[in-house]
Structures are given as C-alpha cells and as structure tokens.
C-alpha cells in the first residue's frame, strides 16, 4: 500500500508541502503534486495514480471541472479539499465523481488516516475478489475484472461505485444501514455523514437500474437503509 501513487492538487504550496510531509511519515514514497487543475490533467494521463487529493477552489479551472475531466481517464478515488462545507457543495462534489470530502481547515493526520483506510479497502477488495461473476436480469458484474455490463453494454464506473456494488452483491436481501454501508465501503466511521452514501447510491442506481427513479435492485427501506434485491419480482438470472 505504501507503493501507492498519490497526487495532491492545490495552488497553496504550504498545504501541498504539509500533506506530503504527513504522507511521507506514513511511509508513502510515490507522491506527485500539481499547482493547478490544468497541471494535474496531464499528470493523471501520464501516470497510474491510485488516489487524488484535489482542491476545489483554485485559480483557473475549478476542482469540480477537473474531477469531471479526470473521470474520463481515471477511476482513482478523488478526495475533495475545500473550505466550502455546505451540504449542497458536498452533493455537487459527489455528483461529479468525488469519493470523499475534506473541509478546510483540516487535521492532516485525519486526512492521512482516511487515505490509508481508503487504499486499504481498495487493495483488500482486489485481493479478495473471487472469480465469481454476478449475473442478474439486467446487468452483469465481475469484481475481479472491475467490469460492469448493463443491458449488454460496458458501463464506466468509479472504483468507489464498484466497491459499493460489490458490497451489495455480497449481501443480497439484507437490510443495510447507511452507517453500515459507509463503514464497510469507505473504511472508517461515518459520524452521521449520510449524504455520501445517498449520493453514491443514487449514482449507482443511474448505472444499473432500468428506471433509477423507480429502482428494482437497490431499494430503500424507510427508516432503516437499503436492500439489494438480486432478482426483482421473482426474475431468475
């Protein structure tokens, strides 16, 4: 995990240097940095980046715009770093493809812990992925190959959404709370952060459901959480 490539994108050099120092103390050696979103795009194109820490408010292209472009080349987890902390801002960030949201001012040790937890979860998911392919009426999912086929066509999906889908597939017909999903998929306590789970489930529904507004596979259990139904309405794969 210490061999992971981490890209830090922020126009404040002091913040970049602080994050790099903390990550280096944690044992990470492959740390890249960029001073702008425009500078970050070619770095992502030229390197296999495992995780990106991306500032939202920078001169020129914003982090939101950069995230959308990065998603064309990479499914690496993206942690937004920003002073904008409203729920609306967080929802906007998750909507464009972010995986986590760190509010300034922040504790660099907490950021390092979140990065480690996320990378650990990603590597564990890859190591434990079996050869099993989950085949349902409308989509097929291969965790080992990170491949999602919906309606006969390959669908691009971020690593975080694939981990979320894998967790649901591994727990069919079980009611899962938002806190439970967050802790298992993101790798650390949710502290009541339900928006993260809700937005990612909405995005996952947009990928796998025939009608995301009337989901068949990932259904809401009011007051409790969500249930994954592998064969809606008695359908058999």
UniProtKB/Swiss-Prot annotation:
UniProt keyword annotations, A-Z: Activator, Cytoplasm, DNA-binding, Phosphoprotein, Repressor, Transcription, Transcription regulation, Two-component regulatory system
Post-translational modification remark: Phosphorylated by YvrG.
Signal peptide (UniProt feature, chain positions): none
Modified sites of kind 4-aspartylphosphate: 55
Disulfide partners: none
Keyword Mitochondrion applies: no
Chief place where the protein resides: cytoplasm
GO cellular component, one term: cytosol
Gene3D superfamilies: 3.40.50.2300, 6.10.250.690, Winged helix-like DNA-binding domain superfamily/Winged helix DNA-binding domain
SMART domains documented for this protein: REC, Trans_reg_C
Protein name in the entry: Transcriptional regulatory protein YvrH
Source species of the chain: Bacillus subtilis (strain 168)
Name of the encoding gene: yvrH
């Amino acid at each position: 995990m210490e061999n992971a490539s981490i890209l830090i994108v922020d126009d404040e050099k002091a913040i970049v240097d602080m994050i790099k120092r903390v990550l280096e103390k944690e044992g990470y050696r492959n740390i890249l940095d960029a001073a702008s979103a425009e500078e970050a795009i070619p770095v992502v194109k030229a390197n296999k980046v495992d995780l990106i820490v991306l500032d939202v408010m920078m001169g020129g292209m914003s982090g939101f715009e950069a995230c959308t472009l990065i998603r064309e080349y990479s499914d690496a987890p993206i942690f937004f770093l920003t002073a904008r902390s409203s729920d609306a801002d967080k929802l906007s960030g998750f909507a464009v493809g972010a995986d986590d949201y760190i509010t300034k001012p922040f504790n660099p040790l907490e950021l390092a812990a979140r990065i480690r937890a996320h990378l650990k979860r990603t590597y564990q998911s890859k190591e434990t992925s079996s050869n099993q392919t989950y085949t349902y009426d409308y989509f097929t999912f291969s965790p080992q190959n990170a491949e999602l086929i919906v309606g006969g066509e390959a669908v691009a999906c971020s690593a975080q959404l694939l981990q979320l889908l894998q967790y649901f597939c591994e727990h069919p017909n079980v009611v899962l709370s938002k806190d439970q999903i967050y802790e298992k998929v993101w790798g650390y306590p949710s502290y009541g952060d339900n928006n993260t789970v809700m937005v990612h489930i909405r995005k996952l529904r947009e990928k796998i459901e025939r009608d995301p507004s009337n989901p068949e596979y990932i259904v809401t259990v009011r007051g409790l959480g969500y249930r994954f139904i592998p064969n809606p309405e008695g359908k058999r794969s």
